[in-house]
Each structure stands twice: as C-alpha cells, then as structure tokens.
C-alpha cells in the first residue's frame, strides 16, 4: 500500500483506509457490537465517533450524536474540535471506533472527553486495530498507530475509567473478509474491543468529632 500523501492529515489518511476494502471488512466485522453499544443504556443518548463507512446504522438506534474524523477535528452532526460542545455526564455510551490515538488531537484529550461525557455507570466502547495481527500489513503506510490492550488500559485508568480485564478480538486474520464472531482476547484478529466503565466516586464519610463540653464555672 502506498504511503499517504504528505499533504494529508493523519486523521484523513486513516479515514481513507477505512473506506477501502480492507478497512471496510474490519468495520463490517464490528457492526453487531457497535449496535449493541448504541443500545447499551436504553433511555440515554449515545455518542459514536468513527469512520463514515457505517453511518447508516446511526439513525435506527435511539437518540445519539454521530461524529466522523475530519482535518480540523470532527464533522457529521456537529462540526467542531475538542472540547466537544456537549454537556457533561449526559451519555450512557460512548463509542470510539478507530479514532483514538496515543497522542495528538485524537490522543489523551479524546479519552478525557469520553470520561467527561459519560454518566456514572456509562461505558466507553473502544475499538482499535491490533498491532500483533498479520492484517497490520494491510494498514501499513496509512498513518494509523496502534497499541496493545495493556497500554490502552493504562490510558483509560489515567482518565478515571475502569477497563474490563479481557478484550475481544474481532475481524479477519489476514484475508479481506468479514469475520464478526468475537473471541476472548485479541489473538491475531485485525482489531479488538476494550470496554471501560465510569464509576461514581463514593463520598468520603466525614468523621464526627466528639462533643467537647466547656467546664462548669
């Protein structure tokens, strides 16, 4: 695969890869779990940030906001950059589908936004490519950077989220085909899903001081 043009931003180059057959096979393999995420907290809106190839799903699953990566930040139902113009603790689920990165505009600040927007008990659904998969040769030169689950768990904890101990492997191993059946652990699958929950912080009980009586006059 040819390297992306130097004039293209990394977000745009990665987005273009997911519009090609190899990327679309990964997205199609994740479709059932994205649908599950959108219905994870009935009655609460969701936020779905990801490549445009699957946007036709969004209108069928309750109230939500659909954003796609763009050169200047985000496009879709809103044209904006971080911080997102959305109220804190108002979303039951946040789906980050192949948009989170180790650094830059889609790095830690994006995870912090996800944590801010989730209600206590809400969940982040993080879909990322697997750096150990043979399929990585298909995104070579696209500008996509990937990390193993252990690294992502550290990043999620750093923004106050509690990640699941086990991720789910998704997508093909090497052939460009849809492979939707998840497996425990990423293995050699093209991508994996890591979920993390926002826990409510318990109030620290205040120790009552013993009543001090003044001595009688």
Which residue ranges define each predicted feature?
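Class I SAM-dependent methyltransferase SAM/SAH-binding core
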Residues: 32, 36-84
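A short glycine-rich, Lys/Arg-flanked "PGG" loop and its adjoining helix->strand segment in the class I
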Residues: 107-123
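Conserved class I S-adenosyl-L-methionine
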Residues: 123-150
């Amino acid at each position: 695969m040819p390297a992306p043009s130097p004039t293209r931003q990394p977000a745009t180059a990665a987005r273009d890869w997911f519009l090609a057959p190899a990327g679309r096979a990964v997205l199609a393999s994740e479709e059932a779990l994205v649908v599950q995420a959108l219905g994870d907290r009935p009655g609460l809106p969701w936020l779905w940030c990801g490549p445009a190839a699957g946007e036709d799903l969004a209108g069928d699953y309750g109230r939500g906001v659909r954003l796609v990566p763009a050169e200047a930040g985000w496009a879709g139902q809103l044209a904006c950059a971080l911080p997102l113009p959305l109220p804190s603790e108002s979303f039951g689920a946040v789906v980050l589908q192949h948009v989170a990165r180790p650094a830059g505009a889609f790095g830690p600040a994006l995870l912090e936004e996800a944590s801010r927007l989730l209600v206590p008990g809400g969940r982040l659904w993080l879909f990322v490519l697997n750096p150990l998969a043979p399929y990585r040769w298909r995104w070579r030169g696209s500008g996509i950077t990937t990390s193993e689950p252990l690294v992502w768990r550290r990043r999620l904890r750093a923004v106050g989220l509690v990640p699941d101990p086990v991720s789910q492997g998704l997508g093909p191993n090497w052939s460009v085909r849809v492979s939707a059946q998840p497996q425990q652990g990423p293995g050699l699958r093209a991508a994996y899903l890591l979920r993390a929950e926002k826990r409510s912080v318990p109030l620290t009980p205040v120790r009552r001081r013993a009543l001090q009586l003044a001595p009688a006059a």
